[in-house]
Amino acid sequence: MKTTIRKLFVLGLLFSLCFSVSASEKIIKVACVGNSITFGAGIANREKNSYPAQLQYYLGEEFEVRNFGVSGTTALSSGDYPYVKTTAFKQSLDYLPDIVLIKLGTNDTKPQNWCHKNNFHNDYQALIDAYQKLASSPRVILLTPVRCFLDNCTGICPQTIEKEIHPLVETLAWENRLEIIDLFRLFGNSWNSVLMPDKLHPSAIGAGMMAQKIGDYLLQKPTEKTKEPALGNQATPFNFHGFQGMDFQINGISCKLVRPYIEAEGKPWVLRARFWGHEPQTDVALLEQGFHIAYCDVADLYGSEEAIKRWDDFYKFMKRQGFHRKVVLEGMSRGGLIVYNWAARNPKKVACIYADAPVMDLKSWPMGNGKGAGSKADTENMLKAYHFKSREEALAWKGNPLDHARTLAKAKIPILHVVGDADQVVPVQENTTPFETLMAQYNHPIKVIHKPGVDHHPHSLYNPEPIVRFVLSAFGRTQNACVKAIPGNEYRSGAGWKEGAEWHSIAEEIESCLNNRNLKLLLLGNSITQGWGGNRSLVTYRPGKAMMDKVLGENVWETAGISGDRTQNLLWRIRYGNYNRCHPENVVIAIGVNNLIHGDNGEDTAEGIIAVAQEAVRQFPDSRIFVLGLFPVGREAQNPVRIQYNKTHEILNRHKWKGVTYINPTSWFTDNQGNIQEGLYSRDYIHLTEKGYQVAAEKIKELIQSR
């Protein structure tokens, strides 16, 4: 009997182990539901370049992404092509997905459809219900429509998308407590033909941006549900762009708190000063990243003692509710007064500061003691709030945000300002500029994003991604995209390709070109590397071919460069392209400039280059590998991108390389002052001329002949 029990126990244990393994290896099925934008209309090789296809690459093997998009479809069941009447809709239900991404509403704005607008809410709700009733109990996530840049409303109407569809999707998310991802601002507020060639459908590059934003959201690791904050019986709910908000009071003071649907570890939060709901895009994006957004009213107090006391009480309340001990402070305009005055009193409680056109000196605003007009009414209110007995006392006061620079620098608080350079209300020269100068003197520079020609309004950035990245970096929560292997999505013939070629066809041609060869040299990189030309038939611009043929000989070398590639794209190609089929004696890698141009910093770019080199060591075990990092960019030594370039090479120079020889090529192309030598670069000071390729070819020859 005991033996039988023991056998049953062992069998049960084995079963449970097998079950746990299979459960842990369960593929997460993602259904992308939508219209032509989901389908990938107008995108060359849409099977690999539509947003669902690129999302699959981005999410990796733990996910299975399927495209159920149908061009022209509507959420309206009374529309001219209802999604619920398509075969794809039935297939998406039969798929029993774990996650459903719904992106509909654009075609509903056509005149023949929007005449039924009163049915939109209920018809969209019925679509949501259909997925929520599935046996797989999927996460249903609503995607707001992307912005449309069409010029009129004869068909799809941009104004209706912005003013009616977008808010309705947010309302549905709020009512159903559904996760929501804001795509509306992703492509900015002015048309970019690279991202949306026909002003309606994203290109492969635009689809890649969609995939990255959605992918970053889906790859967040949900934390265990925490106890909801105790906000009191009088708290009332409100809709904050699809998220769950609550109005409540502390000691009779109006407060607000908006909760994310997926809470980030540690319960990070933002305390916003003044102008609740104005330019909310940063707050919405941080909610998507798991941050709570909070507000405690300090209106008409101008950062005075009473304002500081209110925030002290609010901070204590949030700490008792289990929120992070360090808060993100966000202030626009006069909100800068309370942000900096509170931070100076509580530097150890501040994670970072994002200030937008902030008032840093009462003399500038509201007193108007400089170039700005100031505000007479606000000056009178400010004098009362501070209990100043006279205007002269206020002018002599030494408790302005500018006066806190030394304290804030000592605390090493990360600080970002976003300013309009033509601000006539809170002039940059009287507020941010002197503060920036002081912080630099105290060895803690701040970051300033300038908006040329912009006045005091509009605040923020239309696409807040740089602000969000700054906040995440302060918490150490940024993911380095430079080291994440994904295919590229370049598609333009201006990339130096024959018409009709796109990234995947170029990548496939490289693989074919390397078959059955034994090369002396294989060059890996981006458009600069592509410019060597080699024997690739789809490449139309090859200024370096004659130079390399001259120094090495014909047919003994090849280029595997692709225009537009960043480190993550080359990493993908090396990992999956089987480039070692050409048995190269030497491999030379030059990559990273596109990372810097697209906003990656020097540190992240360096990590990407190192990841590429490490993968090359694995894939080319019998080759000598040379890493050039990236060629210098920008004409002058003090070019902003060159400064990040230098940071990249500083890190590469310090790195302890294994199986790789690192060479900094800066001196190949620059003079004694660090400026690019005449004639070596084209007018963009990114790409080489024939003379520049001649210099590079001779230097590379020296490298591979050295022992």
Predicted regions and their residues:
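Conserved SGNH/GDSL esterase-like catalytic core that processes O-acyl groups on lipids
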Residues: 26-32, 37-125, 485-614, 634-646
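Catalytic His-Asp segment of secreted/periplasmic serine-dependent ester chemistry enzymes
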Residues: 43, 146-223, 632-707
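Histidine-bearing beta->alpha loop at or near hydrolase active sites
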Residues: 72, 300-301, 450-459, 564
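Hydrolase active-site cap/lid region
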Residues: 81-82, 341-391
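C-terminal catalytic histidine-bearing segment of alpha/beta-hydrolase fold enzymes
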Residues: 200, 204, 219, 425, ...
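Alpha/beta-hydrolase active-site loop
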Residues: 302-322, 341, 608
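Alpha/beta-hydrolase fold nucleophile elbow
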Residues: 322-333
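The feature captures the conserved acid-bearing segment of alpha/beta-hydrolase catalytic domains
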Residues: 374-433, 437-440
